[in-house]
Amino acid sequence: MTESITEIRINDKIFKAKGTYLFGKTAKKYATNEVDEETGKKLETDGVTSIFMGLMQQDPDKLIEFWHSATSHYLKEQPSFEEIATTIEDIAAETGDLKPYFVGALRMLNEDGYYKGKLQTLWFMMKRSSQNKKGEEKEKAKESQELFVELYEEITGKPPYEIKA
């Protein structure tokens, strides 16, 4: 089974990642706004989804944003963004492998109670969106959804959840 790390040591203190209301509140800083090149429409992605999608791409910057959000429940003891970034950089330099941290982050968001429903809805919507399209657009959406399922399985060693659409 793929190793899953949901704790991080910063300044000799261990912090456990939690998906809570405060996670979402902190994650709002990491929401993204992009413009679809094909349609010209503005695409807004909330912070939790933005972090999740970045984790799927094993983006270390999104891993730092995840830990910044996931330690927000510590309130007065929360490590700073810079402390988290330095720790993640040190782990990458020492071990050469952040994958267990990506696995832990993805599983926490996708499987633990607070954001489980939100992410199940995201998976459902990805699957359903391909069913509402026609021709090449439908094929492209289906390939994209399959790619994300494969990515999740490749990283975490298990399927995201049973998608019934």
Could you describe each region identified by the protein language model?
Residues M1-I14, K42-M53, D61, H73-A165:
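Charged interaction scaffolds used for protein-protein
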Residues M1-K41:
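N-terminal leader/targeting peptides and immediately adjacent processing regions
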Residues G19, H68-T71:
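Generic secondary-structure microfeatures
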Residues G19-F23, L63, Y101:
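Alpha-helical structural motif
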Residues M56:
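Active-site nucleophile-His-acid catalytic modules used for acyl/amide transfer and hydrolysis
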Residues D59-S69:
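Elongated alpha-helical scaffolds
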